[in-house]
Amino acid sequence: MKIVLRRMGYGSLALLGILLLFIAISFANHTIKLKIESAILSPPGVMVDVNNHPMHVYIEGSGEHTLVFMSGGGTSSPVLDFKALYSRLSDQYKVAVVEKAGYGFSATAKVPRDIDTMLEETRTALTLAGETPPYVLFPHSMSGIEALYWAQMYPNEIEAIIGLDPAIPQVYEEYPLPSFGMRSLTGLGARVGITRFFPDIVNSSAAIEEKRLSSQEEEIYRALFYKKTQTLNMNEEVKMIRNNAAQVLERGIPDVPMYFFISNGEELPVEDWKNYLVNYIESVKIGRYHLLHNGHYVHDADPDLIAEESIKFIEEL
């Protein structure tokens, strides 16, 4: 029996050694690749200092209205993710994409992810980039919560909200969130470069899968994906989302015009996703919605329709 236990112990140690060796090799490879990839990662917009950490704001176009794009949780490259849609709007309007801490070209920073802090950082970043309200907000997914809060707290700053399959507070009463252990494990895996061994993950990103980017932009997108996946800020947002959503829910529905583009809900772990969003928008004083037959990244799947409908809606404001 002792011999068996001893052999099991040796086997466990051997497996642990192999695992640690794999992690070390992965991390070394990741570090080298990050250094190489840094040569192509030049921010296309302006970098501003907010709460002692650099944030990236990309601005394109000009016009009477300023459209602010707000990325969903975990989107590694908001500027490229939204490109298919804002490039169809920037000939008529000014477009701004704010990349939160831990996203895109913005630095990962030890900052709270409560909704008040995130909103003030977004507003400050826009101000420092030379932009002034009012804005038309284009939030995707989780940023729907921040957009609604913005309209609740500063209604004079918001002309309208055009939601890209946006989350509303009620969905987080049902939405299954990953555990602390799972967030820590996936975050560690991303930081040591294990994601590089699974290229299908980045290849399945909507902007790439829908072929919305040039070959050079795809290269930049991949580099940002490997650098900014499951960052500390992204994981902290997930940790705080139920509290943030509850805070927005308490304040009711803001009185601003809204237009929701709603996905088929099949990529989301909430059975009644579509109904949640439809019920919400039907309670809005000036509210419209469009049911789409595609996945969660609606702006990559159907940018032509969304751009056309958004222009009509904005011109009626």
Predicted regions and their residues:
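Alpha/beta-hydrolase fold catalytic core
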Residues: K2-L67, D91-Y93, T132, E315-L317
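Conserved hydrolase catalytic core segment
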Residues: T132-P176
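Conserved serine/cysteine hydrolase catalytic core
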Residues: L213-K285, H290
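Catalytic histidine-centered segment of alpha/beta-hydrolase-like enzymes
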Residues: L291-P303
